[in-house]
A protein has these predicted regions:
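Acidic (Asp/Glu-rich), glycine- and aromatic
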Residues: 134-184, 379-391
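Ligand-binding face of N-terminal immunoglobulin V-set domains in extracellular IgSF glycoproteins
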Residues: 310, 346-388
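An acidic-aromatic substrate-binding cleft motif
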Residues: 296-310, 383-477, 482
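Conserved small/polar residues in nucleotide/adenosyl-binding loops
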Residues: 560-566
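Beta-strand-rich recognition/accessory modules
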Residues: 215-295
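Beta-strand-rich N-terminal accessory domains
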Residues: 20-89, 187-214, 221
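Well-ordered alpha-helical scaffold segments within catalytic/enzyme domains
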Residues: 316-318, 377, 473, 484-515, ...
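Extended, loop-rich substrate-binding clefts of extracytoplasmic carbohydrate-active enzymes
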Residues: 71-142
């Protein structure tokens, strides 16, 4: 009997350990309770997505783990090309083969990249081993001396979740700083070794790299963060079992960097660097995310942020953990001065799975009484919303006309009382671009300017009208024409009227929250028409785009730069 009990206990223990193993799930990534580890499940490294990604209890903690030429990479640096991805469920391993370079992007493409002159392939393997994972990296060519310590495996740590939070490296402790701080260190740039891989590439090196001395986002590795710490064992969030990750290196040191030093949108970086001659066995990490076995994603209830017109369809969406099967009945409450009243409660429609989650739909279209409402699903609640006939009358499309479009107006000074959104800008527009070049952000210039102006000529009359592209300094003609058309149709078809802004096109002054008795929509139509007509008058045709000639000017952090744009065509 004792032997039977001991055997049963051993069996239960084995079953418990197996339940705590990292296994590849049907979606093709590792899962263990509330811990998920993706290996190139998606590929968008410019946006800090892809590569090795660690998600603990619904929150992304680290991402974009891959081989890089830089300590902290920005969106303008060369990226590898993925050759293959194998999900080996039998061996509980995911293998990805990549290579530097991607020749189609060297000196060419939507955003031309500049690759160093070292061509190699590599394989990243991640294998689930009980309650931890083993990551290895093997190169197919030895690292040259000139890239020793430059090439390495980077894992980016999400800064928004870490500011003010602690870390431990071996016996050293620290706290992630809210603001990027020195010391910095200088080193030779990879741009001293640009390869010659694409004879058809038409990017202009002088325009991209300028004098190679002043700061330039194209050169990301000459002044960087000095390491915050170095060691063999790193613990992220040691104070929080829901977010704790331990990483040990069995090959070389781990180094912790602040990637915000050389990129404003940089992340913290945990890195293993490759010495000269490194080939096979470049990296071996033991990754131990803390596993919360019984964790479940808390339901999220989403209704329309705008609210609903009484006569329209009304459906709330409920997002659940895929493992949830005991569905509750959603409930709709009406909120009044004397409290809340249950209006409707019934089983939701089972919509199905999408990516990591399961979805239900709760239809309450038949509810038409005006007022404040909220959808509840157990303890989860939607934001409070309105059902009303005037639900679109304020604070919806009006915000675009009142704030977004005025702030984006080019060639103007935009004030909001004693705030200056941006000063007079781009009054030097514009100079004709070179021919036969591949510029940034999708702009190219063909073999002809298609007008009387030649490369380098000043084209008069273009310093009027237009809106900056969202986040960048360029005027795309289709955006200018399209926005002006949309606003004109809103006026003609719906009689749309809003007047909260003064716009003086002669003085080039915009005053937000200072009505001038004119329809703001029509004034914005005029702003779009001004740039289009000015281009036609100057060129005898539409321009393709007016944009800044350098990367630093093109994607500014503030709106105070005065720049010299160029005209480009596709």
């Amino acid at each position: 009997m004792k032997k039977f009990i001991a055997g049963a206990a051993s069996l239960m223990l084995c079953m418990g350990l197996h339940a705590q193993d990292f296994r590849i799930n049907p979606s093709g990534y590792f899962e263990n309770g509330g811990a998920n580890v993706m290996v190139f499940s998606d590929v968008y490294p410019e946006g800090h997505q892809g590569g090795l990604t660690l998600v603990l209890n619904g929150d992304r903690r680290a991402a974009n783990g891959d081989v890089r030429f830089e300590i902290s990479q920005g969106q303008w640096q060369g990226l590898p090309k993925m050759r293959s991805r194998v999900v080996d469920e039998a061996d509980n391993e995911i293998r990805v083969t990549l290579s530097y370079l991607d020749s189609a992007k060297h000196m060419a493409g939507f955003n031309p990249m500049l690759y160093p002159d070292f061509v190699f392939g590599y394989t990243i393997k991640v294998k689930g081993e009980k309650d931890y994972l083993v990551l290895t990296v093997d190169l197919d060519q030895p690292v040259p001396e000139r890239f020793a310590g430059k090439l390495g495996f980077n894992l980016e740590l999400v800064p928004s979740t870490l500011l003010g939070k602690p870390w431990i490296m071996d016996n050293r402790t620290g706290v992630f700083p809210h603001q990027a701080m020195g010391p910095t260190m200088k080193q030779s740039s990879n741009m001293e070794y640009i390869g010659d891989f694409n004879p058809d590439g038409k990017a202009d090196l002088d325009q991209l790299l300028l004098d190679r001395k002043t700061y330039n986002p194209m050169i990301a590795d000459d002044i960087v963060s000095a390491p915050l710490a170095a060691g063999k064992k790193f613990v992220l969030n040691p104070q929080d079992d829901l977010a704790k990750i331990t990483i040990e290196s069995e090959k070389g040191d781990l180094l912790l960097y602040d990637g915000r030093i050389n990129h404003n949108n940089g992340w913290f970086v945990l890195r293993s660097e490759f010495p000269a001659g490194t080939k096979e066995g470049a990296v071996k990490w033991i990754i131990r995310p803390t596993v919360t076995k019984d964790w479940r994603y808390a339901p999220v209830v989403q209704a329309s942020q705008v609210g609903y017109h009484p006569g329209q369809k009304k459906v709330a969406v409920i997002e659940l953990d895929k493992r949830d099967t005991d569905f509750k009945q959603p409930a709709l409450y009406r909120i009044a001065a004397d409290g809340r009243k249950l209006v409707k409660q019934q089983a939701a429609k089972d919509w199905g799975d999408f990516q990591r989650y399961h979805y239900l739909q709760f239809d309450f279209t038949e509810v038409t009484e005006e007022g404040l409402y909220q959808v509840m699903y157990g303890d989860a609640a939607s934001p409070v919303f309105r059902i009303a006939k005037d639900v679109w009358d304020k604070g919806i499309w009006q915000a675009e006309v009142e704030y977004f479009l005025p702030v984006q107006m080019c060639h103007m000074r935009v004030n909001e009382k004693y705030r200056v959104w941006h000063d007079f800008c781009h009054h030097d527009d514009a100079r004709m671009a070179k021919t036969d070049i591949n510029h940034i952000d999708g702009y190219t210039q063909g073999t002809s300017t298609l007008c009387k102006y030649q490369p380098g000529d000043l084209v008069p009359g273009l310093n009027v009208g237009g809106w900056h592209d969202a986040g960048d300094y360029d005027l795309r003609v289709e955006s200018q024409a399209g926005e002006a058309y949309i606003l004109a149709m809103a006026c003609e078809n719906f009689g749309a009227y809003w007047d909260e802004t003064s716009i003086d096109f002669e003085k080039k002054i915009v005053e937000i929250h200072q009505p001038d008795g004119k329809n703001d929509l029509l004034q914005q139509v005029e702003n779009g028409a001004l740039t289009i007509v000015a281009g036609w008058k100057a060129l005898g045709r539409l321009y393709r785009g007016i944009l800044c000639p350098t990367v630093r000017q093109y994607a500014p952090v503030s709106y105070t730069h005065l720049t010299l744009p160029t005209i480009l065509r596709v």
